[in-house]
Amino acid sequence: MSDINATRLPIWGIGCNPCVGDEVAALLTRGEALC
């Protein structure tokens, strides 16, 4: 259940706040680059 909630929260945040969504996308991109 925690995985489902963790997946839905970012999507909800991006839908409500595009600016926050951009920041999250940048963090995810950086995380993938580090890996």
Swiss-Prot record:
Expressed in basidiocarps. The modification (3R,4R)-4,5-dihydroxyisoleucine is found at residue 11. Processed by the macrocyclase-peptidase enzyme POPB to yield a toxic cyclic octapeptide. POPB first removes 10 residues from the N-terminus. Conformational trapping of the remaining peptide forces the enzyme to release this intermediate rather than proceed to macrocyclization. The enzyme rebinds the remaining peptide in a different conformation and catalyzes macrocyclization of the N-terminal 8 residues. There is a cross-link at residues 11-18 (Cyclopeptide (Ile-Pro)). It holds the Pfam family Amanitin. The keyword tRNA-binding does not apply. The keyword Transmembrane helix does not apply. Keywords: Hydroxylation, Thioether bond, Toxin. The modification (3R,4S)-4-hydroxyisoleucine is found at residue 11. Residues 1-10, 19-35 form a propeptide. The modification 4-hydroxyproline is found at residue 18. One of its GO terms (molecular function) is toxin activity. There is a cross-link at residues 12-16 (2'-cysteinyl-6'-hydroxytryptophan sulfoxide (Trp-Cys)). Belongs to the MSDIN fungal toxin family. Major toxin belonging to the bicyclic octapeptides amatoxins that acts by binding non-competitively to RNA polymerase II and greatly slowing the elongation of transcripts from target promoters. The typical symptoms of amatoxin poisoning are gastro-intestinal distress beginning 6-12 hours after ingestion, a remission phase lasting 12-24 hours, and progressive loss of liver function culminating in death within 3-5 days. One of the few effective treatments is liver transplantation. This is Alpha-amanitin proprotein 5. It comes from Amanita exitialis.
